[in-house]
Swiss-Prot record:
Enzyme class label: oxidoreductase
PANTHER family: CYTOCHROME P450, P450, PUTATIVE (EUROFUNG)-RELATED
Organism encoding this protein: Penicillium ochrochloron
Gene this chain is encoded by: ptmP
Listed GO biological process terms: mycotoxin biosynthetic process
Annotated glycan sites: N430
Membrane topology: Single-pass membrane protein
The protein's name: Cytochrome P450 monooxygenase ptmP
TM region(s), chain numbering: 19-39
Function as written in the Swiss-Prot or TrEMBL entry: Cytochrome P450 monooxygenase; part of the gene cluster that mediates the biosynthesis of the indole diterpenes penitrems. The geranylgeranyl diphosphate (GGPP) synthase ptmG catalyzes the first step in penitrem biosynthesis via conversion of farnesyl pyrophosphate and isopentyl pyrophosphate into geranylgeranyl pyrophosphate (GGPP). Condensation of indole-3-glycerol phosphate with GGPP by the prenyl transferase ptmC then forms 3-geranylgeranylindole (3-GGI).
Keywords for the protein's UniProt record, in alphabetical order: Glycoprotein, Heme, Iron, Membrane, Metal-binding, Monooxygenase, Oxidoreductase, Transmembrane, Transmembrane helix
Protein's UniProt keywords contain Transmembrane: yes
CDD domains from the UniProt entry: CYP503A1-like (cd11041)
Family named by the database record: Belongs to the cytochrome P450 family.
Length: 446
């Protein structure tokens, strides 16, 4: 019994001691809050915080220890975060300790680089000089482009009758609606109203801008078509789907092809220097004169088309073809554009990447934008892609400047061409592959 009483008393003493420690700690916290003023210099910089005490201790208590434990805290921080910044807590504020080590920023993804370039070039033509350099516009339009294709990719495997329902709950689809409203209210709406006010003012000095937005405004025949919301939606749809995304993907494919087949790089640079030595005097004729580059674009597209199928149509009435095949109304038809362009009966050495193949052919249908029964990646006939001419000029202009002024390479772990991604029959370049890019020098190889 005496032993049991002794054990109970010991346990009671331990509990009292622990409670005393807790009370002392709470008193210190309270004292810190009462005595110490609010830190003058506080920062929300997202860097690691180095503490003398554990992370569960309130900041104010840690600040009390800085005067006596600063050396320990600073050295501990340096040991953990030698190559980057970290934060320490002082009584009067926060200190962000910077590193003197030179850190390299992560290499960009080629798709992101070209997406921004195409968006900026396209904006100059589509909405004029007012907005084409505006960073907020570029970000909003690029995000809108990305969300369109994320939404399309996510909805493709969904049955048609469920797509409207699923589309309403997709985060990318909801973001599209917010971005459209933001772009309309922040950029295009005010720009459209400003142009209409200037036009109706009767000012003889006012000249209509010569850009795509103005063409759409002039061609709008009904009040609904001319409403800023509808103009904005149509403009974004056309630029995002017909120009920005597809051109950025094609340029990414081309860059990957050049990285795994570098023997074609110098001939392209030589042609650029010969045809267009002065970038600032570039004309449409100069870009048309880049025959080797035009052939390279077409050969890259032959190996990496936007899709294996093209020439999509829906039969509007019962139809019997010349071979007797009956197509009832509503039948969805298409052509196997990908396999046709890799068919040995159509193309000599179809599995060999010959960058200047189409320069040698020198036929009317050899051009990048030409269409025919052996080249249907832009469609065929009356309804072939109307924006392919503009896209070709944009791609040649960007590629000319890029190849002339920059060297580029894969990361050390990337030896082969990144595998394309397949979304149904659609072919998309790997958009997550980092590319090291730097300004060209004549004496130092990359």
């Amino acid at each position: 019994m005496t032993v049991m009483v002794s054990q109970i008393e010991s346990i009671g003493q331990i509990v009292r001691d622990e409670v005393t420690v807790i009370w002392i700690l709470m008193a210190l916290v309270l004292l810190a809050y009462l005595i110490l003023p609010n830190p003058t210099y506080r920062t929300n910089v997202k860097v690691p915080t180095v503490r003398y005490l554990g992370g569960w201790i309130p900041d104010q208590v840690d600040r009390l220890f800085f005067n006596t434990k600063a050396t320990s805290v600073i050295y501990d921080g340096y040991k953990q975060y030698k190559k980057k910044a970290y934060k320490v807590l002082k009584a009067d504020g926060d200190l962000v300790v910077l590193s003197t080590r030179k850190s390299s920023s992560p290499p960009p993804h080629s798709y992101e680089v070209f997406l921004r370039l195409v968006a900026r070039v396209g904006a100059r033509v589509f909405i004029g000089e007012t907005l084409c350099r505006d960073e907020q516009w570029l970000k909003a339009s690029i995000d809108y482009t990305k969300n369109i294709f994320v939404t399309i990719a996510l909805l493709r495997p969904v049955p048609g009758f469920l797509q409207p329902l699923v589309g309403r709950v997709l985060p990318s689809s909801r973001s599209l609606n917010h971005q459209l409203a933001y772009i309309k209210n922040k950029f295009l709406g005010p720009l459209i109203e400003q142009r209409r006010e200037m036009e109706s003012s009767g000012d003889s000095k006012y000249e209509k801008p010569d850009d795509f937005l103005q063409w759409m405004m002039d061609l709008a025949k009904t009040e609904q078509e001319s409403h800023p919301h509808n103009l904005a939606q149509r403009l974004l749809g056309i630029t995002s789907m017909a120009v920005v995304h597809t051109s950025a993907m094609s340029l990414t494919h081309i860059l990957y092809d050049l990285l795994v087949m570098p023997q074609w790089l110098q001939p392209l640079r030589d042609e650029i220097q010969e045809v267009n030595p002065d970038w600032h005097s570039t004309t449409q004729a100069h870009l048309i004169g880049l025959k080797g580059m035009d052939s390279f674009l077409k050969e890259s597209q032959r190996f990496n088309p936007p899709g294996e199928l093209s020439f999509h149509r829906v039969v509007k009435h019962d139809l019997t073809l010349s071979d007797g095949l009956f197509l009832p109304k509503g039948t969805h038809i298409c052509m196997a554009a990908g396999p046709i362009s890799r068919d040995a009966d159509v193309m000599s050495d179809p599995d060999v990447f010959d960058a200047f193949r189409f320069v040698k052919e020198n036929r009317p249908t050899s051009g990048f934008v030409s269409t025919g029964v052996t080249n249907m990646h832009f469609g065929l006939g009356r309804y072939a892609c109307p924006g392919r001419f503009f896209a070709a000029f944009v791609m040649k202009a960007i590629l000319s400047r890029f190849l002339t002024n920059y060297d580029f390479r894969f990361g050390p772990d990337q030896k082969d061409r990144p595998k394309n991604m397949m979304i149904g029959d659609k072919i998309v370049p790997n958009v997550s592959t980092p590319i090291f890019i730097r300004k060209r020098t004549t004496s130092q190889p990359l």
